[in-house]
Amino acid sequence: MKRVLAALVVALVAALLFYGYYSRSDQTWLLCLLASFPGLLYLVWQGMPRPSSETNRTLQRLGGTLIACFMLISVHLLYQQVVAAPAIRLKIGSQGTDNPISDPRRADAELRVRRGRIFAAGGQPIADTTVLPDGYVARSYPNSYTGYLAGYYSPLRFGNFGLENLYDDYLSGRKGNNPLLEAENNLLHRPTYGSDLYLTLQADVQEVAQDALAGCGGPQRGVCRGAVVVLDVQTGAVLAMASNPRFDPSQIAADPASDPKAERDRITAYWNGLVNDPSNPLVLRATAGRYPPGSTFKTVTLVAGLDTGKYTLTSPFTDPGQVSLNNQTVYDCTTCRPAGTGPRYSLVEGYKWSLNVVFATIANDLGAGEMAKYISSFYISRDLRADFDLATSSLCSTAAPTDIQCILSGPEAKNLNVASSYGQGQLQVTPLHMALIAATVGRGGELPRPYLVDHISQHPTSEGQPGRVLQKTSPQVLTRVMTPQTASTARQAMYTGVQSGWANGAAIPGWVVGGKTGTAETGRGTNHAWFIAIMGKDAGSPQYAICAMIENGGEGSSYAMPIAKRVMTYIAGRK
């Protein structure tokens, strides 16, 4: 009977300790630890020999109690030193809003790590580490055109952001190194080396895109706000991802060789300037900016109409300039309809001249269910599973970006379905996502997963040999959106837009270019300017997908398309 009871007590004590351990709560752990003490005490007492006298019994129980207490303390110390050690090491207290308190040894150790570097596709450094004479290291970002894409590294002030945060375990050496070698290095006080990131980013294309954005013009005054994205159509690799305005991460990184107070004041002043800047330079518009896409989204509606088999490029439409659908009047833009044309148009004419009435008619005819299926298949309101920070494009303006019910049910559903067909309604899409939609058409109907990190490698050896590759990105297809035949037809519509439509200013000699302009109404102020394009040497196999977007830029053909044209011209001229 005693053995059965002892076994039950052991099981109870183990259950309490395991529950406290997996709760990851200090309070729960301590309560479970205290609750296990009576059982632990019982087991210790049961394991002792029977005393020969009452005095021995008292001494024995006192000794058993002390043993149980020491066992309890030992278990708690083991928990603190092994399980909770990382959390304790990173814990930050406060003596008021401006006086954070943390373990200085953690900060000291962090500033001595040979943090991994970040490189562009051609080997150009995006983020680098310099070892100072006293053993500390300084983080630097040599190229202002690409540095902000790494994010920022500020462990003592503002934390990490972007790639510096997402890949911190690799960059700091906590992941990817040989555990035995790390233990030896710690024992012998050798420095820890982080792993290096190699990106798909092409630094020269990024610089051209950034320069084009800096002088984007437009009716707005002050800082030009916008984004340019260039993707490899066949793989989904990000070749350029420019945003304007941008921040300088080197101004946030501390220099350990400088006076600590002066550095703190300098960094704080720069940070406060960023936070208070009305142009929001901390928002990377290529990936975090979400906007109504305007007529560029007619590409999605075009695909839906073609892929269902209900329409061809020659399908006729009657478009007198406006149409009433579901008690809502849809208008063509006043400058879209070329003089002397209409009211009969084919679908390809509606696309190249960006006629809202044509695409509203398609969406209304297909119905919200069919439209929602194609919009969702392009991963609108879905996670693209990118390997970098990327906002989720959304169909509905609800708290959950994955919600698509606004066009399926409710009093405004039919109207929102129609408005979404030409890129208005509640649609909010990132520039990168619009580039991906163009890439999907260019790739034959398959939606590629966008990625920025080509591979992660260990730090080179002391003999100068390249480090071991820890992780290599393989291109992935997220889904097939349309048939190859539909994709070929949609590409032809995009090519026609450049050959004889409003995108004719994007033509490049010797290259096959397809494009779609967009002018998105914002409901307040000037419209957003958009342009998406595909380009290649062969009409059947485009190589690049491009998106340019200018906040409050005005007409897409006047302000976004010239920026994309400048980037495409550079790409076409490279050897």
Protein language model regions, located:
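Periplasmic/cell-envelope proteins involved in peptidoglycan metabolism and beta-lactam response
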Residues: 1-266, 278-290, 312, 369-376, ...
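Beta-lactam-recognizing serine transpeptidase/beta-lactamase-like catalytic domain environment
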Residues: 3-5, 11-17, 234-295, 300-552, ...
